[in-house]
Amino acid sequence: MLDVTWEWIAIDKAALDVANTVVVEKGVEHDLLASDPAYQRWAAAAARSSELMPVETAALASAQAPIVEVRKHIRALFHATAAGEPLPKAAVARLNKASRAAPQWPELGTNHQIEQIAIGDAVDRLLARYARSAMEIAADGRAKLRVCGAPSCGMFYRPRRDPQRWCSEPCGNRARFARHYRAHRRTSSRSRMRT
């Protein structure tokens, strides 16, 4: 069992956070939302890290199956986007459907504030939020979405600078260490062969 603490890569892009609930450890993918207790921990953390309304927070706690299903399409969309490939038709269709299920528009209040109005049930609004977030990321294009190149990571991230190849410093450190280890191992095996 993986020991998980939720690290939010992009608070402003909820789709990245839901997509990154599938992690790679020693070359094996692990679904961090597969068990109900793990999903409930993630849902509680997701509710705290975003601007969910109370009704959406309650909906999140009971939306494991639809979240996991939409996540599958978000991940397919992100893999294609990061690779510069055409977007999968099934993923586009499912995310468009999720977005349409909860129409949203801004309205100006008498207090000079703009309020976002959304219709549809709370689960539909939640799925629409993730779908729209994924659409925005995919529309930004390949240069703005990458898959971490560190060993045993594979998380999606948006680089803060152009040459960035890892989602975080710890991943960069692991990648550099692995590269150094491989180079050192090759050098030492060559010197043993000569003697």
Where would I find each of the regions flagged by the language model?
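Alpha-helical elements of the RecA-like P-loop NTPase motor core of helicases
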Residues: D17, A175-A178
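A generic structural signal for secondary-structure junctions
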Residues: A44, R100, G172, R182-R185
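Cysteine-rich micro-motifs
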Residues: D162-G172
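Contiguous alpha-helical segments
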Residues: R179-T195
